């Protein structure tokens, strides 16, 4: 049950804590493979880790970094056929037994493929619950374990097609306690079979805006299906509430030394998203042929090809996702 854990880190003081939290809280520690693209001023001392042989590590000077998707692409390049793929951010904490919990949930969903091929390639994803840093030096954190309900992802009502094909996403808490279907992905929490890395390789040409939406549509049209689960066994440190300073890729101090500035990368990213939905990108970085954008419109209420909102409630509220029996194909609703 090997798990390939992909982490792209940018100047993040919590990277080491994230690695240890994943390792220490796993039931099958020896089955973990960490793949890390560490964009920082000073590299980690990987040789000091007791599980050094389970870490595939690349250090990149921040001045040479080209953004989060570029870094995630590099982290994926160390994949060597592991059974499962987990992508997280470098400021994440885990519950005990998280590896078994994720696998059991995925297998439960996959079991439904006997009735419908829609369930053959599931992806579990979410915007995880938050955690707080109580004492950074002592490694003390407070995990938001109180709300164990399923949290879903929808489009933000105030940001639909705000920049060409791009619309912002938002996590929405529910009072639901079972698996639900999903139609969007969160880059900071993806758990699926390892073949995802080969079928949907990260496109390094995206920057920040466009990352999650492009990946979701590439995966969906290649036959992958998305699901949310209750009580997701990992937690995320959100920058808007964090008391731990952390640079972002577009930090002026770092960006001033780069040949290509972050705003140029962002523009190219948004243009590429337009090209994706216009089906102007071919090969593994383009859309697949197993499902269409019309199929996606049926499950999401969004017509990406024509930049139209077909059903505002379906696209921006949790009602639709929690109303569908997760064991039924939502495209055939």
Predicted regions and their residues:
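Catalytic cores of eukaryotic secretory-pathway lumenal/extracellular enzymes that build
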Residues: 2-301
């Amino acid at each position: 049950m090997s798990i390939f854990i992909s982490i792209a880190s940018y100047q993040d003081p919590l990277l080491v804590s994230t690695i240890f939290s994943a390792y220490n809280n796993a039931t099958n520690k020896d089955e973990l493979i960490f793949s890390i693209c560490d964009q920082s001023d000073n590299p980690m001392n990987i040789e000091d880790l007791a599980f050094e042989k389970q870490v595939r590590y690349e250090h990149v000077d921040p001045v040479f970094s080209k953004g989060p998707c570029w870094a995630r692409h590099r982290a994926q390049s160390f994949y060597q056929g592991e059974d499962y793929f987990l992508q997280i951010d470098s400021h994440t904490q885990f519950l005990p037994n998280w590896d078994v919990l994720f696998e059991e949930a995925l297998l439960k969903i996959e079991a439904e493929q006997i009735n419908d091929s829609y369930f053959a390639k599931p992806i579990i994803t979410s915007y995880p619950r938050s955690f707080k840093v109580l004492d950074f030096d002592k490694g003390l954190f407070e995990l938001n374990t109180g709300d164990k309900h399923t949290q879903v992802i929808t489009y933000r009502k105030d940001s639909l097609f705000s920049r060409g094909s791009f619309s912002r996403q938002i996590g929405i808490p529910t009072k639901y306690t079972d698996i639900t279907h999903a139609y969007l992905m969160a880059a900071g929490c993806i758990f699926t079979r390892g073949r995802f890395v080969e079928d949907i390789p990260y496109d390094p040409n995206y920057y920040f805006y466009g990352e999650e939406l492009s990946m979701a549509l590439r995966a969906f049209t290649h036959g992958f299906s998305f699901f949310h689960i209750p009580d997701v066994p990992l937690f995320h440190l959100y920058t808007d509430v964090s008391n731990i300073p952390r640079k972002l890729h577009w930090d002026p101090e770092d960006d001033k030394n780069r040949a290509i500035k972050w705003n140029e990368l962002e523009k190219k990213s948004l243009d590429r998203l337009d090209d994706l939905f216009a089906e102007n990108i071919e090969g593994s970085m383009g859309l697949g042929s197993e499902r269409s954008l019309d199929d996606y419109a049926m499950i999401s209420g969004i017509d990406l090809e024509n930049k139209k909102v077909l059903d505002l409630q379906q696209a921006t509220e949790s009602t639709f996702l929690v109303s569908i029996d997760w064991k039924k194909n939502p495209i055939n609703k």
